[in-house]
Amino acid sequence: MKMLLLLCLGLTLVCVHAEEASSTGRNFNVEKINGEWHTIILASDKREKIEEHGNFRLFLEQIHVLENSLVLKVHTVRDEECSELSMVADKTEKAGEYSVTYDGFNTFTIPKTDYDNFLMAHLINEKDGETFQLMGLYGREPDLSSDIKERFAQLCEEHGILRENIIDLSNANRCLQARE
């Protein structure tokens, strides 16, 4: 009986692990990221980029998957007003990587997603000979569990982003009223 219980537990863990994907992996299905998303956390090695008046404090509303690109519908807050912005991110020659021009040249990947709950993105911005990185945690719902947030914080640390540069936006004005 114990052996059967251990086998079931092991298979459950394998199935949960198999559900996660990375845009650079073979099992990534870009079609499954199509739809509505909410910005939960932003992190950057240049914190000012994601602070209240930072150019990269963007709130994702939707990803629309096309054949070789993604249309990203985002909102930004300027002078307490929500503005909508759409960007087209094109596939690059690297597997699972997309590029978009916004305040410089950006490339990004999706290191982790389970499609149904969360998506973790890693972006590198190049502008005027300088670079910085940004990571975002996005959810299908307006907030995510503390476990997923902690996994995201660990991924940020793996990319050299300090915990003090991680901003939880689940209680910030994310232009949710503009989504209707």
From Swiss-Prot:
Subcellular compartments: Secreted
Main location: secreted
Signal peptide: 1-18
InterPro entries: Calycin (IPR012674), Lipocalin (IPR002345), Lipocalin_CS (IPR022272), Lipocln_cytosolic_FA-bd_dom (IPR000566), Maj_urinary (IPR002971)
A Pfam match: Lipocalin
UniProt entry keywords in alphabetical sequence: Disulfide bond, Pheromone-binding, Secreted, Signal, Transport
One cellular-component annotation, GO: extracellular region
Molecular function, one GO term: small molecule binding
Disulfide-bond pairs as recorded: 82-175
Tissues showing expression: Because of their involvement in the coordination of social behavior, Mup proteins are thought to exhibit variable expression depending upon gender, age and status of the studied individuals. Expression may also be strain-specific: in strains C57BL/6J and 129S7, transcriptional support is lacking for Mup17.
Record's function text: Major urinary proteins (Mups) bind pheromones, thus stabilize them and allow slow release into the air from urine marks. May protect pheromones from oxidation. May also act as pheromones themselves. In this context, they play a role in the regulation of social behaviors, such as aggression, mating, pup-suckling, territory establishment and dominance.
PANTHER family linked to this entry: LIPOCALIN (PTHR11430), MAJOR URINARY PROTEIN 1-RELATED (PTHR11430:SF76)
UniProt record similarity statement: Belongs to the calycin superfamily. Lipocalin family.
Name of the protein: Major urinary protein 17
Origin organism lineage: Eukaryota, Metazoa, Chordata, Craniata, Vertebrata
